[in-house]
Amino acid sequence: MATRTQARGAVVELLYAFESGNEEIKKIASSMLEEKKIKNNQLAFALSLFNGVLERINEIDALIEPHLKDWDFKRLGSMEKAILRLGAYEIGFTPTQNPIIINECIELGKLYAEPNTPKFLNAILDSLSKKLTQKPLN
């Protein structure tokens, strides 16, 4: 059975595909997750994260942007956007504790992104979590 960490990794891959222009990913997300052995409770968890990010993507991007300081959101890599969006969604709209979310995103950054990305993700998501002290926003 897949772990929540594996489910989050699969969601990041789906979000990356979506950001890269594959809008069809929404229709086949469930079957793609099942191919990755994400099933039962973890499948429901992964789909809730994926669909939640897509439903609130503009709101999530607006939450992230003020914390980028000298960065332009549009110039971030697709993988960085995917991980930040997942982290921001979980911080803002789920009951999962912020340190757990941030740590998971750092680990995803180590796995999927450039070597300096985990520090970048940590800084942005930590800043965001401090601003959003009340959970959840929805």
UniProtKB/Swiss-Prot annotation:
Classification via InterPro entries: NusB-like_sf, NusB_fam, NusB_RsmB_TIM44
Gene Ontology CC entries for this record: cytosol
Pfam families assigned to the protein according to its UniProt record, in alphabetical order: NusB
SUPFAM superfamilies reported for this sequence: NusB-like (SSF48013)
GO terms for biological process, alphabetical: DNA-templated transcription termination; transcription antitermination
Source organism, top-level taxon: Bacteria
Gene Ontology molecular-function annotations: RNA binding
Keywords (A to Z) from UniProt: RNA-binding, Transcription, Transcription antitermination, Transcription regulation
HAMAP family for this protein: NusB
Family: Belongs to the NusB family.
Function: Involved in transcription antitermination. Required for transcription of ribosomal RNA (rRNA) genes. Binds specifically to the boxA antiterminator sequence of the ribosomal RNA (rrn) operons.
Protein name, per record: Transcription antitermination protein NusB
Natural source organism: Helicobacter pylori (strain P12)
Organism lineage: Bacteria, Pseudomonadati, Campylobacterota, Epsilonproteobacteria, Campylobacterales
